[in-house]
C-alpha cells in the first residue's frame, strides 16, 4: 500500500539530529535492528540522567525532526501515508494500521515513528472502551467513537448478530452521528477500534463480555456451534 521504504525514511529523518537525541529516539521507538523499544527509565539509567530528562530529549528530538530539511523533503512521503490511512477509514486501531500497511513485522516500529512525527496524524491512547488508535480527522474520530459507544449500549448482553446485520445496525448509529454511506470494510475496521464489541469464530458479533463472543476453549466453541444449529450434531460435524 505504501510506495516507499519506511526504514529508509526514518533513517533520513533522524540523520540530522545530534547523536544523543538520535539514539534516544531509536531506543524509544525500537528503530534498531533488534526492534526493541526501551523505557524512559532504562535509557535514563544508561545516560545517568532522569526519566523526565529523557522525555524532554525525546520531545525535543521529535520537534527538531519536524523542523528539519529532511522532514520537508519527505513531505510527499507523509502525504502518501496519510492517503493510506484515509483509504482505510481515517480512524484506525494501531494494530489495524500495522496489519494493513506494513510490508513485514520489522516495519511496525518505523510506521509508529512516522505516525508520531508526522503532523497529519493524531494519537489516542488505549482506554477502557477503545484500543490505541490513530486518526487524521478529529471530528470523524469523535463521531466513530460515539457511534461505537451507542452501538454497545444498544446490544443485549448475550445476543449474537450476523456480521451483515451488525454492520447495518452500526451504520444506523453512525448516521445519527452524521457519518453516512461508508463501505462495509471501513465500518468493520472501525468496529475493531472498540474493546467492548467483538466477533466470535463463527463470524457473529456481540458484546465482548458475552461468553458467546469471548470463546476460551474448544468446549465453548462446540457449545456455540451446537447452539447455532439448534439440534444435536455428531462430534465430527462439530469438529468441522
Regions flagged by a language model, labelled:
Residues 1-240:
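C-terminal non-catalytic scaffold/interaction domains in large multidomain proteins
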Amino acid at each position: 500500500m505504501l510506495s516507499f521504504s519506511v526504514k529508509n525514511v526514518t533513517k533520513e529523518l533522524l540523520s540530522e539530529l545530534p547523536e544523543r537525541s538520535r539514539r534516544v529516539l531509536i531506543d524509544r521507538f525500537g528503530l534498531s535492528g533488534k526492534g526493541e523499544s526501551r523505557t524512559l527509565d532504562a535509557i535514563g539509567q544508561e545516560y545517568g540522567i532522569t526519566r523526565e530528562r529523557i522525555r524532554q530529549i525525546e520531545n525535543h528530538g521529535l520537534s527538531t525532526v519536524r523542523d528539519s530539511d529532511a522532514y520537508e523533503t519527505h513531505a510527499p512521503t507523509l502525504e502518501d501515508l496519510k492517503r493510506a490511512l484515509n483509504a482505510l477509514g481515517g480512524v484506525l486501531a494501531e494494530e489495524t494500521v500495522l496489519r494493513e500497511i506494513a510490508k513485514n513485522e520489522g516495519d511496525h516500529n518505523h510506521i509508529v515513528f512516522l505516525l508520531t512525527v508526522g503532523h497529519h496524524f493524531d494519537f489516542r491512547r488505549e482506554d477502557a472502551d477503545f484500543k490505541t488508535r490513530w486518526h487524521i480527522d478529529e471530528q470523524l474520530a469523535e463521531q466513530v467513537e460515539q457511534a461505537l459507544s451507542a452501538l454497545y449500549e444498544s446490544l443485549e448482553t448475550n445476543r449474537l448478530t450476523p456480521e451483515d446485520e451488525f454492520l447495518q445496525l452500526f451504520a444506523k448509529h453512525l448516521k445519527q452521528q452524521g457519518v453516512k454511506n461508508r463501505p462495509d470494510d471501513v465500518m468493520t475496521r472501525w468496529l475493531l477500534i472498540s474493546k467492548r464489541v467483538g466477533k466470535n469464530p463463527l463470524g457473529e458479533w456481540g458484546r465482548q463480555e458475552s461468553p458467546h463472543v469471548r470463546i476460551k476453549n474448544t468446549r465453548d466453541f462446540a457449545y456455540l456451534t451446537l447452539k447455532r444449529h439448534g439440534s444435536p450434531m455428531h462430534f465430527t460435524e462439530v469438529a468441522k
